[in-house]
Amino acid sequence: MADVLERVTKIVVDRLGVEETEVVPAASFKEDLGADSLDVVELVMQLEDEFEMEISDEDAEKIATVGDAVTYIESHL
């Protein structure tokens, strides 16, 4: 999990301009990290590129926190 979490954290820090210490599994992209809907779409696209996978729109809607993203990615690698 650490490797996936580290990679997700780097993407979130780069995309949202937040501090690395703010990017914890329980952090909500919108409420805690200040992402808007477009930011979330762009994050999902960047995660797809980074992990060479496709995340369906239906699944993307369920990814609300950093932990959700890590869990989803780990279960689909």
Curated annotation (Swiss-Prot):
This is Acyl carrier protein. The keyword Metal-binding does not apply. 4'-phosphopantetheine is transferred from CoA to a specific serine of apo-ACP by AcpS. This modification is essential for activity because fatty acids are bound in thioester linkage to the sulfhydryl of the prosthetic group. The modification O-(pantetheine 4'-phosphoryl)serine is found at S37. One of its GO terms (molecular function) is acyl carrier activity. Pathway: Lipid metabolism; fatty acid biosynthesis. The lineage of its organism: Bacteria, Bacillati, Bacillota, Bacilli, Bacillales. GO terms for cellular component: cytosol; membrane. Belongs to the acyl carrier protein (ACP) family. Residues 2-77 form the Carrier domain. Gene3D superfamilies: ACP-like. One of its GO terms (biological process) is lipid A biosynthetic process. The keyword Lipid metabolism applies. Carrier of the growing fatty acid chain in fatty acid biosynthesis. Keywords: Cytoplasm, Fatty acid biosynthesis, Fatty acid metabolism, Lipid biosynthesis, Lipid metabolism, Phosphopantetheine, Phosphoprotein. It comes from the Bacteria. Pfam families: PP-binding. It comes from Bacillus mycoides (strain KBAB4) (Bacillus weihenstephanensis). Its main location: cytoplasm. It is found in: Cytoplasm.
